[in-house]
Amino acid sequence: MGCCTGRCTLIFICTLQMLVALERQIFDFLGYQWAPILGNFLHIIVVILGLFGTIQYRPRYIVAYTIWTAFWVAWNVFIICFYLEVGGLSKDTDLMTFNISIHRSWWREHGPGCVWRLVPAPPSKNLGDHSFISVTGCIIEFQYIEVIHSAVQILLSLIGFVYACYVISVITDEEDSCRHK
C-alpha cells in the first residue's frame, strides 16, 4: 500500500482527533465541566478503537468508530447550541457540570486578552466560598472559543466518517476477493 492510502489518511485523522480531544479534555478539566469530560473520555477511547481497527484491518472496530462519529457530531452540535443559547439553552446554567457546582468554562475567565478581577458579591447572591469575578477585555468571548472547539471536532469527525466508510469498503472488498480465489 502507498503512503497516501485511505487507511493512512484515516490513521492521521484519528491521531489528529485524539490530539484535539486531549487538548479539549485538559481545558474541560480546568473548568470542571463534567459532561464534556465524560464525552471527551468516551471519544478518546473510541478513536483509539478506530485507530486499532484501522491498523489491524478490523472492520468491526472501524464500524464502531463510524457509528460513534455520528453521536460525536450530535454532541458537538448540542455544545454549539448550548454556548450560542439556541433553543432555550443557556450557557449560564450548570448543565455542563451536572448541576453539582457553579463552575463554568475555563475560557470564561482565561480567554485571550481577558482581564479578571475579584469584586464583592452582591448581597442577593449566595455564592458560598466562591468569589464573584468580573471579566473584561476579552479578544474573543469564551462561548466562541467553545464553538470553535466543537466546530473543529465536527469537521474532523465528518472527514473521519467518510474515510472510515472508505476503509471499511476497501477492507471488506479485499476480504471478499481473498475468499473467492
From Swiss-Prot:
InterPro entries reported in the protein's UniProt record: Na/K-Atpase_Interacting
GO cellular component: plasma membrane
Pfam families named in the record: NKAIN
Membrane-protein topology: Multi-pass membrane protein
Coiled-coil parts of chain: none
Compartments reported by the entry: Cell membrane
Keyword Transmembrane in record: yes
Entry's transmembrane regions: 5-22, 35-55, 62-82, 151-171
Keywords: Cell membrane, Membrane, Transmembrane, Transmembrane helix
Superkingdom of source: Eukaryota
Family the UniProt entry places it in: Belongs to the NKAIN family.
Subunit-level organization: Interacts with atp1b1 C-terminus.
Protein name: Sodium/potassium-transporting ATPase subunit beta-1-interacting protein 3
Species assigned in the record: Xenopus tropicalis
Lineage: Eukaryota, Metazoa, Chordata, Craniata, Vertebrata
Gene assigned in the entry: nkain3
